Swiss-Prot record:
CDD domains: RlmH-like (cd18081)
Residues at which S-adenosyl-L-methionine binds: 72, 103, 122-127
Superkingdom field: Bacteria
Pfam families: SPOUT_MTase
Keywords from the UniProt entry: Cytoplasm, Methyltransferase, rRNA processing, S-adenosyl-L-methionine, Transferase
Chain's role: Specifically methylates the pseudouridine at position 1915 (m3Psi1915) in 23S rRNA.
GO cellular component: cytoplasm
Catalysed reactions, semicolon-separated: pseudouridine(1915) in 23S rRNA + S-adenosyl-L-methionine = N(3)-methylpseudouridine(1915) in 23S rRNA + S-adenosyl-L-homocysteine + H(+)
Native source organism of the sequence: Cronobacter sakazakii (strain ATCC BAA-894)
Keyword Transcription recorded: no
Protein EC: 2.1.1.177
Keyword Iron-sulfur: no
Assembly and binders: Homodimer.
Protein name: Ribosomal RNA large subunit methyltransferase H
Length: 155
């Protein structure tokens, strides 16, 4: 199984790239994790936000292909670390690759939400999307460590 983070936005601060890369390199070869960045649509005073969201959504879904789609969204289901580890095990048993979608400033398109098999809420708080990349990578690495009895996670 391959994990794929599909995120809107291409120019992240150095600290985001450093943090994300740190967890990316820790993933084992039998569970590769990749980042696919979708260019954010131009937002301005008179921007058609729905059209921008729809275009970003089309690109995200094209990148995900036939993968299991999991959206990152506030109204999604909150998983604690052991629950995420169980989800990761289910995904591995399913055999399909998994695409986790992070929207832009206005969130995800309706098409992305409709295509999702699951929706994961990291918090009821609104989090900066660059920070979400790092949190997701660390959370998935921690979940993997539980499933393999790796000493990274401590109870």
């Amino acid at each position: 199984m391959k994990l794929q983070l599909v995120a809107v936005g291409t120019k992240m601060p150095d600290w985001v790239q450093t943090g994300f890369s740190e967890y990316l390199r820790r993933f084992p070869k039998d569970m590769p994790f990749e980042l696919i960045e979708i260019p954010a649509g131009k937002r301005g005073k008179n921007a058609d936000i729905k059209r921008i969201l729809d275009k970003e959504g089309e690109m995200m879904l094209a990148a995900a292909g036939k993968n299991r789609i999991v959206t990152l969204d506030i109204p999604g289901r909150p998983w604690d670390t052991p629950q995420l580890a169980r989800e990761l095990e289910r995904w591995k048993q399913d055999g399909r690759d998994v695409s986790l979608l992070i929207g832009g400033p206005e969130g995800l398109s309706d098409a992305c939400k409709a295509a999702a098999e699951q929706s994961w809420s990291l918090s009821a708080l609104t989090l900066p999307h660059p920070l979400v990349r790092v949190i997701v990578a660390e959370s998935l690495y921690r979940a993997w460590s539980i499933t393999t009895n790796h000493p990274y996670h401590r109870e």
